[in-house]
Regions:
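Short, C-terminally biased terminal segments at protein or domain edges
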Residues: 1-51, 55-121
Length: 121
């Protein structure tokens, strides 16, 4: 089951790829101020969202497709946790823009999961 894997023409891949680039930039800022532990966790979860969405494009079945997006959904939740932790900690860069973009991605991913489940039954 192969679908559109082009970042330029697949909206969810574009959203998650651009978000991953912004997460990398944010984490580099954290690294410069010595906040390595949070940076490492956030970098892993924040870039994994798009990696799993990309993997879903070559899923072996509809069930596998749904599963990959469920993993993306879990990574979204983890990323949200780390960003909110930064938001409420002292001397961390602002996370509001990232949290807003993450909410947009979360809505898209949840819609993909819901519609795929509906069409799968």
């Amino acid at each position: 089951m192969t679908v559109n894997t082009s970042i330029e023409t697949n909206p969810v891949l574009k959203l998650t790829f651009d978000f991953a680039l912004d997460i990398i930039t944010y984490c580099e800022t954290l690294d410069k101020s010595g906040k390595y532990v949070i940076s490492k966790q956030l970098l892993k979860s924040g870039t994994s969202i798009g990696a799993n969405a990309n993997e879903a494009q070559d899923a072996e079945s509809k069930a596998d497709f749904i599963h990959k997006f469920k993993i993306s959904s879990k990574e979204i939740k983890e990323t949200k946790y780390w960003l909110k932790l930064c938001q409420h900690s002292k001397e961390y860069p602002d996370t509001n823009a990232l949290l807003n973009r993450l909410l947009e991605i979360e809505k898209v991913v949840n819609k993909i999961i819901a519609s795929s489940k509906k069409n799968h039954l």
